[in-house]
């Protein structure tokens, strides 16, 4: 999101803290005073690229669990318009064969053109449906669940593509 006043520019980034989304901004030039009217716009290209990378992390997590085992646990991630990083716990380094299997599975699900669906439901209903939640995370009574066909189902508040074939 960016904000422009004559002679001023502000950059605003979405942040997730404590399970809540917020917007954090900093002035790149100029000043904004209390009571001024500002105009905000979303950087659509950056948003589309970010949602692609964010959706890909869901496929990657499921592929890692499928290839390496259900013990794989997400420890962190970074999603930006130009890249993604997925940190996870596993008891040993991945072999070249395991990496190739994960890559092939992610590519298969991208090419399968899975519908990406979002539902809001009671947290207990979501858990019973098989949606994956982050261990130790606290959730509200109502949660957002993102499903990618029958392949991946997770608690998630992020932005996503409508279909996995939009990732290719």
Task: Please state what every model-predicted region is.
Residues 2-4, 8-168:
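A glycine- and charged-residue-rich anion-binding loop/surface
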